[in-house]
């Protein structure tokens, strides 16, 4: 399913988590292995430094080191990658983007500054100043509630008219009505929806998939995408019900705690395609524990073995 007015091809987008040792040093060989493994599993569209990749927590030396390794390994593995930047102001975001741009990146993921909710004029100025600084690059907007403002279809329609290199979005949260709204009012953009919303979103238009469960079960993610490509509403409904049940079981298993997105992604890697992946997050954020990983793996083997890698 393609759209002749789309600025960016649809596809499956997958996050790369960043492994740290006990002293919070970058484990580059393991990170490179992850990039290669995702490509081998059929996921060449990858990004780093969203919330899952700890873009909110990383300092500049780590940002530079990870970005350098990411771009180098992507080129060798044939991955189509983007680098995320999270910051509290336009100058801070542009500064980080410039580092990645100098290293060779030409596709970026950005989110609104989160210190205060932006008004319409401030949203427009942010995209003008950020995207306009790098006219040779493509931008995906990471739309999430913790920025204080979720952009709507009308917001995106306004931005499409003024920002030619805004090509995609990542809709981390939202309802089915929100999915229909952004797909209908801004079809020029490739809108990526996470696994829990994608089955419903795909019934409203040419949705892309943000595959947070890809490290757990590449096969099931490809099945989900294939059902959407066929327009198989019955299969999508069954799969959505299965995803809801899986998520309820899996995320009620670990001990409770204030876990950031990266904690979940690292746990999925650990119990999925990369059993040795470390669970640590950069300070001050709390990751899952080794006991959590053991319990979650046992839960998957007992109740959802069809979601585990072959």
What residues fall within each predicted segment?
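A structural signal for short hydrophobic/aromatic patches embedded in well-ordered alpha helices
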Residues: 66, 126, 159, 236-239, ...
């Amino acid at each position: 399913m393609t759209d002749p007015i789309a600025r960016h091809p649809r596809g499956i987008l997958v996050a790369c988590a960043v492994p740290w040792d006990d002293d919070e040093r970058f484990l580059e060989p393991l990170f490179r292995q992850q990039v290669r493994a995702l490509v081998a599993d059929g996921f060449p569209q990858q990004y780093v430094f969203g919330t899952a990749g700890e873009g909110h927590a990383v300092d500049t030396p780590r940002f530079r080191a990870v970005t350098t390794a990411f771009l180098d390994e992507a080129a060798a593995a044939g991955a189509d990658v983007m680098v995320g930047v999270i910051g509290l102001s336009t100058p801070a975001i542009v500064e980080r983007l410039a580092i990645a741009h100098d290293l060779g990146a030409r596709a970026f993921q950005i989110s609104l500054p989160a210190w205060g909710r932006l008004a319409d004029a401030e949203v427009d100025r942010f995209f003008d100043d950020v995207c306009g600084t790098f006219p040779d690059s493509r931008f995906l907007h990471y739309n999430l509630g913790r920025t204080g403002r979720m952009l709507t279809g009308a917001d995106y329609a306004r931005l499409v008219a003024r920002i030619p290199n805004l090509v995609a979005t990542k809709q981390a949260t939202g309802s089915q009505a929100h999915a229909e709204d952004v797909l209908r009012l801004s079809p020029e953009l490739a809108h990526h929806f996470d696994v829990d919303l994608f089955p419903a979103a795909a019934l409203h238009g040419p949705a892309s998939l943000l595959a947070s469960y890809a490290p757990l079960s590449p096969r099931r993610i490809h099945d989900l995408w294939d059902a959407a490509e066929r327009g198989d509403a019955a299969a999508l409904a069954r799969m959505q019900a299965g995803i809801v049940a899986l998520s309820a079981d899996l995320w009620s298993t670990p001990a409770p705690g204030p876990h950031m997105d990266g904690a979940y992604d690292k746990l999925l890697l650990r119990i999925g395609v990369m059993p040795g992946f470390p669970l640590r997050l950069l300070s001050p954020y709390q990751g899952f524990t080794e006991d959590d990983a053991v319990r979650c793996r046992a839960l998957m083997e007992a109740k959802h073995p069809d979601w585990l890698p072959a």
